[in-house]
Amino acid sequence: MDYIKEKLYQQLAIDYCCQVSDIKDDKNHFTEYEKLKGRRQFEEAADCVLKVIAVNGKLIFTGKKSIIEVCRKQFSNNSGNWFMDASNFRKLDEILMNEGYRVKTAHPFFIPKDDCVHEINGVEIKKYNQEEILQFKDDDRFDEAFCFSEESPDVLAVAAIIDDEIVGMAGASADSPSFWQIGINVNKNFEGRHIATGLVSMLKADILKKEIVPYYGTSFSNLASQHVAAKAGFEVAWVELITGRMEFLG
């Protein structure tokens, strides 16, 4: 699905204030951040001091000009393949300290490698549109499926139901007009029945039909979630590091 990668490069170029050619080449790039139209608004801070992606074996930095210039001097020759390591996080924290910021998190992100759907046996499937999703606000069973954010609204969902009980929910948030992020919750009593894989693959296929790119993010250490992504037809495409104010991080 080469067209998906092309759309990814276009999206990352907007998010990181660079050219598509900068995403594709083999050099590290450092840009001053601007809030460009069409950017993903995933965990977006009011002011972006620094964020970094590792993609295609290289790095793209964007943020406040003074911070970016320090990063350029320190990381120009670093490999993207080995950058997302605790030792580099500590170096970034030292650079960010005077601004009152530090590394917040780093996640691997996945994009579709196929449009296949994995059926789930013995369950009822129900789909929800943006308006219908609102009934689940403040329902902590679905804290991964939905974010209820004005910046990245929840727009589509699919549930697995057994004996009139929702046992799994996958939701998609519109992080940008062309990239929707998928989240998933499954009742612990029903884990191991491939419900997560099925729901994520169904939502993936529905989003692709809208000519929008579904994507999936998780933690480095959440191996179960990474397995769900792989089984649902996703492959890892980039790693993203974001920063936040110290007072908000504790």
Where are these regions (language model features)?
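Conserved acetyl-CoA-binding loop-helix of GNAT-fold acetyltransferases
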Residues: F61, I182, G192-D206, H227-K231
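Acyl-donor-binding surface of acyltransferase catalytic domains
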Residues: E6-E131
